[in-house]
Amino acid sequence: MHSLQAKILDPRLGSDFPLPQYATPGSAGLDLRAMLKEDTVLGPGQTLLIPTGLSIYIADPGLAALVLPRSGLGHKHGIVLGNLVGLIDSDYQGELMVSCWNRGESPFTIAVGERIAQLVLVPVVQAHFELVEQFDESQRGAGGFGHSGSH
C-alpha cells in the first residue's frame, strides 16, 4: 500500500465525518465528501464546484489520482462529475474540488458530508514524441469511430 501526504482543510473532516477510506478490502476508490457550509440543492442542468476539505500530495511522478463519480449517484439521481473525470497530478497540492453536475430532471440536495466522488490512484507512464514521416503499417491503420465493429 502506498502512502499519501494529506492535509485536512476542514476541521469537520475526521471528527464529524470520517476521513476518506476504502469501503472494503477490495475497493479501488477512497470516498470524497462534500464539505459544504450547508446542504445545497443542485437543480437540473446545474453544476457546482464542491470542496472536499482535503488536499493531498502524491509526490511520486509515477502515480496520479483520478476523481471518479460514485455509480449510485449517477444511476439513481443523475449526479455525475461536471468534467467527467478529474485528474490530480503528482505535484498538485491544492484542495481537492469536485465538479458535480445534475444531468437529471429533478433537483437534488447534496448534504453536508455526503460521499460525492471517489479518488483512485493510478500508475503514470510518461512518454516523449519520436517524430516520424510515417508509421509502420498496422491492421487497423487510421480507422476509428466504429471501424472495428458495429457493437
UniProtKB/Swiss-Prot annotation:
Q: Which Pfam families match?
A: dUTPase (PF00692)
**What family is reported?**
Belongs to the dUTPase family.
Q: Extract the GO molecular function terms from the UniProt entry.
A: dUTP diphosphatase activity; magnesium ion binding
EC?
3.6.1.23
- Residues binding substrate, per UniProt: 70-72, 83, 87-89, 97
Per its record, how is this protein called by name? Answer: Deoxyuridine 5'-triphosphate nucleotidohydrolase
Q: HAMAP family recorded for this chain?
A: dUTPase_bact
CDD domains under this entry? trimeric_dUTPase
Recorded hits in InterPro entries, A to Z, give: dUTPase, dUTPase-like, dUTPase-like_sf, dUTPase_trimeric
Q: Which organism is it from?
A: Pseudomonas aeruginosa (strain UCBPP-PA14)
Q: List the disulfide bonds.
A: none
* Keywords per UniProt: Hydrolase, Magnesium, Metal-binding, Nucleotide metabolism
Required co-factor(s) are:
Mg(2+)
Q: What does this chain do? A: This enzyme is involved in nucleotide metabolism: it produces dUMP, the immediate precursor of thymidine nucleotides and it decreases the intracellular concentration of dUTP so that uracil cannot be incorporated into DNA.
**SUPFAM superfamilies per record:** dUTPase-like
Biological process (GO), any one: dUTP catabolic process
Pathway where it operates: Pyrimidine metabolism; dUMP biosynthesis; dUMP from dCTP (dUTP route): step 2/2
List the catalysed reactions: dUTP + H2O = dUMP + diphosphate + H(+)
